[in-house]
Structure formats: structure tokens, C-alpha cells
Amino acid sequence: PKLALFEERVKEFNVPTLNERSNSPVDYCKLYRERYMPQKEKSLALGAKVTYLIPPTGKYAALGKNALVDGLFGGATFVDSWIGWEGTDGAFVIDLGEAKEIHSVETDFLHQIGAWILFPLKVVYSYAEDGEHYTHWRTIDLPEERTGEVKFRGVKAESAEPIKTRYVKVEVTGTKECPTWHYGVGHPSWFFIDEVIIK
């Protein structure tokens, strides 16, 4: 009710943006509903063990133990619930603890161009029951994003038939450097993930 009232009022008074990131109030309300309201179906990855094959950068390595599987989405600032990699690719394995039937895996990314945080180029998902012999699930190429707005993007692999597995591997190809159109051209760029959702 409060969110609906807030949305109604900002429309009534023609509030164009909420902050310096140029997100409209309508976008804010939509994001809030999608990211922060309780969801009916819980992720199978909640509380799972995460093993990094390519560890996060700096302080994010220590934060990375639980952040990707704590059920909490990060906000528009990259200091809360986000794990980052700078100038490199990233890779990790989610251990569900036992073999389970899954239908989808989704990784949530942040785009904040002013902080040199860009969406990655590609995400590859694979799975294994034994943690050694992985079967490729899906490779997803992401379109380049140049907007100055803060954005979130879920990158999802789905299967119509259930897949029985214990381990899910996520491999991310980052941009590694700021591209030619970015004012940080040639300098290391980041990508950030806040949550992995498995259902």
C-alpha cells in the first residue's frame, strides 16, 4: 500500500527522477517490487556453498562466502550485497548439498557506468552431479549497455524438463577494460553479481 501511494504521488506531482542516477519513480517502484518484496518461491541456492574458481577482487573475496546465496538483492550502490571482479573474468560453483531437480539458474548483474561497472560480455552455465564432469547448459551473450542509468540484469538459463544435479557452475566473461566510448577507456572495468537464483 505504501509503495502504491508513493508511486501515485510521484506521478501526480510529475517527479522526473529520484536521484542523480536518473532513475524515474516508476522504474524505482517496479524495481522495488521485483527485487525487494518477498517472493513466493525460494531459491534452491539459498545458503549453498560457493567455491570460487576465479576469486572476486580485493575485499570482495572475503564478502563472497555468502553474498551470492543469501537471498538478498543488492541496491543501486555496489557496497551492499554485491561481489565484484575487476579487470578479469569470474567463475564459481554452487554446491546444493545433494542432487536436486532444477529448472532454472539466474545470475543478477549491476550496470553503473559512472563507477566503471559494466554488464559482462557472456555467461556460461553448466552442471554436474559429481562436481567434476560438467555438462554445458547454456551460453548467453549480453548486448552492450551504454546508458548512464543504473540497471540490473538477470541472466537466466531454463530447461523445460527438470535437470537432476548437485553442482552448478557459472562462468562469466567480463569486459576487463573500459571500452573506447567510455571515459575510462583502457582502464580496468568491473562486473558485479549480487545473487544466484536456482529453482
Regions found by a protein language model. Give the residues of each.
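Predominantly extracellular/luminal regions of secreted and cell-surface proteins
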Residues: 34-73
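Aromatic, loop-rich ligand-recognition surfaces of beta-strand-rich domains
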Residues: 73-138, 151-199
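Generic low-complexity segments that are intrinsically disordered, proline-rich and/or Lys/Arg-biased
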Residues: 2, 17, 26, 39, ...
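Short intrinsically disordered coil segments
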Residues: 65-67, 141, 185-187
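Solvent-exposed serine/threonine-rich low-complexity stretches and specific carbohydrate-binding patches
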Residues: 136-146
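Glycine-centered secondary-structure boundary/capping sites
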Residues: 14-18, 47, 71, 161
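Short, surface-exposed linear segments at secondary-structure transitions and domain or protein termini
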Residues: 44, 58-62, 87, 144-153
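Catalytic domains of carbohydrate-active enzymes that cleave complex glycans
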Residues: 1-40
